[in-house]
């Protein structure tokens, strides 16, 4: 049986990197994107290969829709060259950027940048990739616990993620005839460099969040990588149109 192929955006660092390596260890091959830091992407390729997978890294800024047509061609070429296939199996819309600024202070330019990366970009990238996603495949969008929780300064970012949660349900309904399952994973606070590394590096922030989390700590990249693997496993094929939060019970 041929290995399943996963396309993950934004996997040269953080949660995407962790998920890519864990998926490779579970028998998946990986196409992943990076926006900058090509050396990090090469490191990820080596990690994936050590985990037993095959990997291809492609440069892409998800917030720049003018790059999409060229990117689609590169994906098709990679599929033919490395797997002799025309389709891949799973898409993970992971790429993103943090933003902490009050509603009253957020500029139109900042709003547009977040919209492009977190909603408009994934919307049209997924649309353009549909012919290359195998029937019976999966789409996993990445949201945030901030669509349920309310922290001043996170409203613009959370609004874009909320839009993705609504879109997920519609994608699941409309793509069901192709047996494509679509779900969305909402991580809670995680120790990564995302958003300047606040949760990881600021002990006061870390301790505060841990204090009102049921499991008594903030999340680690492994927690989310394991969740991605579970949602994309063969055993979860009857799950679609669901928001799945992985937060350790944050702010119950």
Which residue stretches match the model-derived regions?
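Residue(s) in the substrate-gating loop at a strand-loop-helix junction
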Residues: 144
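Short C-terminal tail/terminal secondary-structure segment
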Residues: 149, 229, 240-252
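Substrate-binding pocket helix/loop in short-chain dehydrogenase/reductase
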Residues: 102-103, 107-115, 205, 209
């Amino acid at each position: 049986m041929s290995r399943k192929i996963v396309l993950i955006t934004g996997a040269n660092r953080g949660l995407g990197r962790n998920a890519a390596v864990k998926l490779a260890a579970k028998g998946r091959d990986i196409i992943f994107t990076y926006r900058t830091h090509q050396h990090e992407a090469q490191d990820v390729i080596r990690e994936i290969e050590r985990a037993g997978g095959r990997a291809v890294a492609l440069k892409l800024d998800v917030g720049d829709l003018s790059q999409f047509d060229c990117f689609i061609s590169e994906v098709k070429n990679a599929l033919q060259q490395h797997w002799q296939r025309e389709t891949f199996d799973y898409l993970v819309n992971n790429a993103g950027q943090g933003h902490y600024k009050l509603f009253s202070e957020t500029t139109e330019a900042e709003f547009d940048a977040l919209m492009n990366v977190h909603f408009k970009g994934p919307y049209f990238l997924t649309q353009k990739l549909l012919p290359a996603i195998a029937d019976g495949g999966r789409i996993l969008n990445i949201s945030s616990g901030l669509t349920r929780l309310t922290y001043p300064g996170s409203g613009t970012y959370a609004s874009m993620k909320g839009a993705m949660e609504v879109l997920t349900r519609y994608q699941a309904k409309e793509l069901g005839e192709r047996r494509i399952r679509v779900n969305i994973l909402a991580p809670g606070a995680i120790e990564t460099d995302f958003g300047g590394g606040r949760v990881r590096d600021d002990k006061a922030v870390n301790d505060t969040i841990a204090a009102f989390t049921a499991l008594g700590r903030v999340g680690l990249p492994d927690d989310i990588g394991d969740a991605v693997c579970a949602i994309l496993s063969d055993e979860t094929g009857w799950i679609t149109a669901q928001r799945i939060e992985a937060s350790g019970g944050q702010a119950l």
